[in-house]
């Protein structure tokens, strides 16, 4: 039986994001800049990560509190060995209606078929440019955009539903908006443009680098005949638009200019097993891993999850506009731990 719970702001819980690793094979400046995450950087040892059985248990308990959707994140989740085994286990949980994965796409040909066979059907690929030279400068690993586009084509060919996520930075890749809208329109793949977010302590965020949703929409409307699409469900973060000629859609995510805190239904477990109520958390999360490993029962674990949600009052994006300077000085949790 599902127990309906809400947080301090009346928001239900519907989504669980599981970060399965803090490692990544890219070094994008806004997430894991190479100057900080160099060759000598020490990542979490294996025993500090949640095991697949622990993640399965967490997900199963969360379904009793209303979780229906699970997204696997990182770091780069495809760097976690045997990830397909976790997907298979999550697919067996009663109450889980949807499982998704966010990836940079580099390893899709290597692992995609096993993931599909395990029951994964939806993938979001982070791709910030389709210009090869620009994309190489963004990922700092000399990976061409063409390489990722080939991986995307492969994923689509074996049956995955794919969406593309683009973090837009003014003066960096905002000139990619129109080419990417056109490219993925022709492919009939949804591309979503995300306002550059203030996540973590190392990404050099500055408001002047933000290209707002209204700016992006204006650019796109000058080139394409589009119409707005009604939201599909409560808490949907992207505002979607449809091309009138072929029906292909794209989305704009207003993570900075128009907060969606009031409808956020996500709980997050970091790669080291801590609970966070917000991607922009500024305090260390409750250590679920240690709590579980102390020998608690499922009932005790559920009670703790309920307690953590009941006291949740995170609304960082709302607060940013109210007291930007004070909030920018707070220490935040880096995205490779908490998951995008």
UniProtKB/Swiss-Prot annotation:
Binding-site positions, [4Fe-4S] cluster 2: 261, 264, 278
SMART domains in the cross-refs: Elp3 (SM00729)
EC numbers on record: 4.1.99.22
GO molecular function: 4 iron, 4 sulfur cluster binding; cyclic pyranopterin monophosphate synthase activity; GTP 3',8'-cyclase activity; GTP binding; metal ion binding; S-adenosyl-L-methionine binding
Record-linked CDD domains: Radical_SAM (cd01335), Twitch_MoaA (cd21117)
One Pfam family in the UniProt entry: Mob_synth_C
GO BP term, example: Mo-molybdopterin cofactor biosynthetic process
Residues that, per the record, bind GTP: 17, 71, 102, 163, 266-268
Binding-site positions, [4Fe-4S] cluster 1: 24, 28, 31
Record's catalysed reaction(s): GTP + AH2 + S-adenosyl-L-methionine = (8S)-3',8-cyclo-7,8-dihydroguanosine 5'-triphosphate + 5'-deoxyadenosine + L-methionine + A + H(+)
Quaternary structure and interacting proteins, as annotated: Monomer and homodimer.
Function summary: Catalyzes the cyclization of GTP to (8S)-3',8-cyclo-7,8-dihydroguanosine 5'-triphosphate.
UniProt cross-references to HAMAP family, sorted A to Z: MoaA_B
Protein name: GTP 3',8-cyclase
Organism: Staphylococcus carnosus (strain TM300)
Primary gene name: moaA
């Amino acid at each position: 039986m599902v127990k309906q719970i809400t947080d301090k702001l009346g928001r239900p819980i519907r989504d669980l994001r599981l970060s399965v690793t803090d490692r990544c094979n890219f070094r994008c400046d806004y997430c894991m800049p190479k100057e900080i995450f160099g060759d000598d950087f020490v990542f979490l040892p294996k025993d500090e990560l949640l095991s697949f059985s622990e993640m399965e248990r967490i997900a199963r308990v969360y379904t009793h509190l209303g979780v229906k959707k699970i997204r696997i994140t990182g770091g780069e989740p495809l760097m976690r060995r045997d990830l397909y085994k976790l997907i298979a286990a999550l697919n067996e949980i009663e109450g889980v209606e949807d499982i998704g994965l966010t990836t940079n796409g580099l390893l899709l040909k290597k692992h995609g078929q096993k993931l599909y066979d395990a029951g994964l059907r939806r993938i979001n690929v982070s791709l910030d440019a389709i210009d090869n030279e620009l994309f190489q400068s963004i990922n700092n690993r000399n990976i061409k955009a063409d390489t990722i586009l080939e991986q995307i084509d492969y994923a689509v060919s074996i049956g995955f539903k794919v969406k593309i996520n683009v973090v837009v930075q003014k003066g960096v890749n905002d000139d990619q908006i129109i080419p990417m809208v056109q490219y993925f329109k022709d492919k009939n793949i949804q591309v979503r443009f995300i306002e550059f977010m203030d996540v973590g302590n190392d990404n050099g965020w500055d408001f002047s680098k933000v290209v707002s949703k209204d700016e992006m929409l204006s650019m796109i409307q000058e080139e394409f005949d589009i119409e707005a699409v009604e939201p599909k469900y409560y808490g949907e973060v992207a505002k979607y638009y449809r091309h009138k000629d072929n029906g292909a859609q794209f989305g704009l995510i207003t993570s900075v200019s128009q907060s969606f805190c009031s409808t956020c239904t996500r709980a997050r477990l970091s790669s080291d097993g801590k609970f966070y109520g917000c991607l922009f958390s500024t305090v260390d999360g409750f250590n679920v891993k240690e709590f579980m490993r102390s020998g608690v029962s499922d009932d005790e674990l559920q009670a703790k999850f309920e307690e953590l949600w009941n006291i949740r009052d995170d609304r960082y994006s709302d607060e940013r506009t109210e007291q930007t300077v004070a909030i920018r000085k707070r220490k935040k949790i880096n995205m490779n731990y908490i998951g995008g």
